[in-house]
From Swiss-Prot:
This is Mannitol-1-phosphate 5-dehydrogenase. It comes from Buchnera aphidicola subsp. Acyrthosiphon pisum (strain Tuc7). GO terms for cellular component: cytosol. Its EC number is 1.1.1.17. It catalyses: D-mannitol 1-phosphate + NAD(+) = beta-D-fructose 6-phosphate + NADH + H(+).
Length: 385
């Protein structure tokens, strides 16, 4: 069995590539970073340190190779593999779709009918379904029947934390023991691959939003609040009592949306929040706030980790003040090395805060949602001082 993994970063190597290799796949990584590509091809293996609650261990990931995403030979690889996975970030999916489209066309022209399943592992709800729509837009209509018959696009939810830690070995990664990979079993074409610890669900939306509204929401709010106070790591931010209360309360607010929407058991969900907090506090998984907070425009989109639960609270007439504080903190974020942060700051300066919120978050003009964010923005420094 062969798999092509787009993205050789932390999640790509530390979670997806590792899991696929342990499941018996030969894994080909595709990335635009030629240094990483060369390192993988030179070593043909890499090491991952797993941080557990009781003990740590290091595992050797073998059967790996790599190709640059711009290499024209990648279409041949796409036509021959059994599985494609991605971990490139939601904004890069459209570029990946163009590459996948060329591979599918090559597969069709060579009359290959072996089913191909594609799992986009991104922090975007139904990212594989989104990827499919982009591929269909680029694929000639005469090939659409082939795609619908032989190409599966499987939506999923992934949950794990892999911090960026400087190592002498560029390929070495430190990961947490906890991991979750849940997929929609109904979207596979052909035989369902046997992948270690992969779980199947017929109600994937609930799991996707549970992770997005809890891990991702809490992570982002802790980062943006912590950066206002010049903290460096997630542990530093969570150790601040005022920030801790806001983050925990925001996760409970987003949790109330989930409980209402999906009929989750309240006590079970509060236990899930507690587990997330313990993961944030793990000193062996120290993660930099600048990494967590990067790409604020993406994180402030209507369907992402901050605005979606916030709007859910309005939808069900539930508390939202701490979610609003987290969103306000995101508009404070400024990092001269982050292009999205620069664009965000420039928009606030030129267009004003209200217009920027309306545009980026896709919120109604003169709405309670917008004014609640502005209110918290004007108070945020006093609140966490």
């Amino acid at each position: 069995m062969k798999a092509l993994q787009f993205g050789a970063g932390n999640i790509g190597r530390g979670f997806i590539g590792k899991t696929l290799s342990e499941s018996g796949f030969s894994v080909i990584f595709s990335d635009v970073n030629q240094n990483i590509v060369d390192a993988i091809n030179y070593n043909r293996e890499y090491f991952v340190k797993i941080i557990g609650s009781n003990q740590n261990k290091t595992v050797n990931i073998k059967r790996v190779s790599a190709i640059n995403s711009n290499d024209s030979n990648i279409k041949k690889i796409i036509s021959s593999v059994d599985l494609i996975t991605t971990a490139v970030g939601p904004t890069a999916l459209e570029k990946i779709a163009l590459i996948i489209t060329q591979g599918i066309i090559f597969k069709i022209k060579n009359q290959f009918t072996k089913p191909l399943n594609i799992i986009a592992c991104e922090n975007k709800i139904k990212s594989s379904s989104f990827l499919k729509q982009v591929v269909l837009k680029n694929l000639p209509i005469k090939y659409h029947d082939y795609l619908n018959k032989y190409i599966g696009f499987i939506d999923c939810s992934i949950d794990t934390i892999i911090p960026s830690i400087n190592n002498k070995d560029d390929l070495f990664l430190t990961v947490e023991e906890f991991k979750e990979w849940i997929v929609n079993i109904n979207q596979f074409k052909g035989a369902v691959p046997k992948i270690v610890d992969m779980k199947f669900s017929n109600n994937l939306d609930a799991f996707i939003e549970r992770k997005l509204f809890t891990l991702n929401t809490g992570h982002a709010i802790a980062a943006y609040l912590g950066l206002i106070k010049n903290y460096k790591t997630i542990q530093d931010a969570i150790s601040d009592k005022k920030i801790r209360v806001i983050v925990r309360s925001a996760m409970e607010e987003s949790g109330s949306v989930l409980i209402k929407r999906y009929n989750f058991n309240k006590n079970d969900h509060l236990d899930y929040i507690e587990k997330i907090f313990l993961r944030f506090e793990n000193p062996f998984l120290s993660d930099k706030l600048e990494r967590i907070g990067r790409n604020p425009l993406q994180k402030l989109r209507r369907e992402d980790r901050l605005i979606k639960p916030f709007l859910g609270a309005f939808e069900y007439n539930l508390p939202y003040s701490n979610l609003a504080k987290g969103i306000a903190a995101a508009f404070y974020y400024h990092n001269k090395n982050d292009l999205e942060s620069i664009e965000l700051s420039s928009s606030i300066k030129k267009q004003g805060l209200e217009s920027t919120i309306i545009k980026i978050c896709d919120l109604p003009v003169n709405s309670k949602e917008v004014y609640s964010i502005i209110l918290e923005y004007n108070l945020i420094k006093k609140i966490i001082r």
